[in-house]
Amino acid sequence: MVDPQSPITPHLYPQAIQLKLYQAFIFSIPILFSIILFLLFYLFYLKRRASSLSSPSPMILPVSSSHQTSSHLPSVCLLDVKVELKDKLHVVLFNEELGTRDSLCCVCLGEFELKEELVEMPLCKHIFHLDCIHLWLYSHNTCPLCRSSVSISSTKTSVDDDNDHPDSPQTSPV
C-alpha cells in the first residue's frame, strides 16, 4: 500500500502549481506588453492632439518677436495691413433703422442688441459685430456675407464718395 505521507505525492503537487504559475507568467507578459504599448500610443495621440489645438495660428503670433524667420515676415506685413484695414472700417450703433435691414451677425449668428457697436462694411453696407468682423478680416479680405472685396483703397474711396455724394447708392465690385 501506498502511504499517504509518501515523499512522491507532495513533490508532484508543487510542480503542478509551479507549472501553472509559469504558464500564467508566460501568457501574461505579451498581454501586459500589448497594454503598455497601447497606452503609450494613446498618450502620444493625446499629446499631439492637445498640441495641435493649443498651437497658435499665424494671425496670433506676436509681431514684435525678435527671432522671426523670413517665412514669418509676409504674414507680419499682412497682419499690419489687416490692422490698418480694421481701423478704417465704419463703426455704427445698432438702432431700429438698422434692425429693419439686418438683425443678426452672419459670422457668429448672434442677434444685435440696441446701442451695440457694430461695423458697417464700406461697399456693401452689411453690418457685423465688432469682434466678429475683426477676426474675419484677419484671414479674409472680403465681406463674410456677399464676398465683396474690402481693401484699404476701397475703404478710403468709399468714405470720400460718401462725403461727396451722400444720396448716391454704393455699388459692389464684380
UniProtKB/Swiss-Prot annotation:
This is Probable E3 ubiquitin-protein ligase RHA4A. Its EC number is 2.3.2.27. Keywords: Metal-binding, Transferase, Ubl conjugation pathway, Zinc, Zinc-finger. It comes from the Eukaryota. Residues 155-174 are annotated as: Disordered. GO terms for biological process: protein ubiquitination. Expressed in stems, flowers, cauline leaves and roots. Probable E3 ubiquitin-protein ligase that may possess E3 ubiquitin ligase activity in vitro. The lineage of its organism: Eukaryota, Viridiplantae, Streptophyta, Embryophyta, Tracheophyta. A zinc finger (RING-type) spans 105-147. The keyword Ligase does not apply. GO terms for molecular function: transferase activity; zinc ion binding.
